[in-house]
Design a protein with these regions (language model features):
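Core segments of cupin and vicinal oxygen chelate
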Residues: 6-51
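Vicinal oxygen chelate
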Residues: 3-11, 60-84, 87-125
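Eukaryotic scaffold repeat domains enriched in small/polar residues
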Residues: 55-56
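Short acidic/glycine-enriched loop/turn segments that link adjacent beta-strands
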Residues: 37-40, 62, 102-105
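Alpha-helical elements of the RecA-like P-loop NTPase motor core of helicases
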Residues: 16-17, 79, 119
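Active-site/binding-pocket entry motifs
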Residues: 51-52, 62
Length: 125
């Protein structure tokens, strides 16, 4: 099980605003800043209000290097995420739909963030 992800972004403030808006339907929001010490970079944590599991740091992004998915409670939350992400400036990768190529209970939407990273929100039933 994954505990956290650190994503390098070109503009932390812009990316933080994007992810807060796009992930609002999943109740994921900015949680805390972490001032790096002893060579550790400054991080901005996004999470569920109890802990941060998705961190942003400033640097040179490499969108080819990673893809990830957030879990949704149901298909409607996937659809809400998609609308929120597009409204926040995401570019379409794959619109919400059943992904029968994976298996019958896989429903997801996939977008590109401001730095070109591909990520999805998925409901598995």
């Amino acid at each position: 099980m994954i505990d956290h992800i650190i994503l390098t972004v070109s503009n932390v403030e812009h990316s933080l605003a994007f992810y807060e808006a796009a992930l609002a339907p999943l109740d994921i929001k900015f949680f805390m800043p972490y001032k790096g010490e002893n060579g550790h970079p400054d991080l901005w944590g996004v999470g569920n209000g109890k802990s941060a599991f998705f961190w942003l740091k400033h640097g040179k992004p490499d969108p080819r290097a990673i893809h990830w998915g957030f879990m949704a409670q149901n298909n409607a939350k996937v659809d809400e995420f998609y609308q929120a992400a597009i409204a926040a400036g995401a570019k379409v990768n794959i619109s919400p739909r059943a992904r029968m190529e994976y298996y019958s209970g896989y429903y997801a939407a996939d977008v590109f963030d401001p730095d070109g990273y591909s990520f999805e929100v998925v409901h598995k039933s």
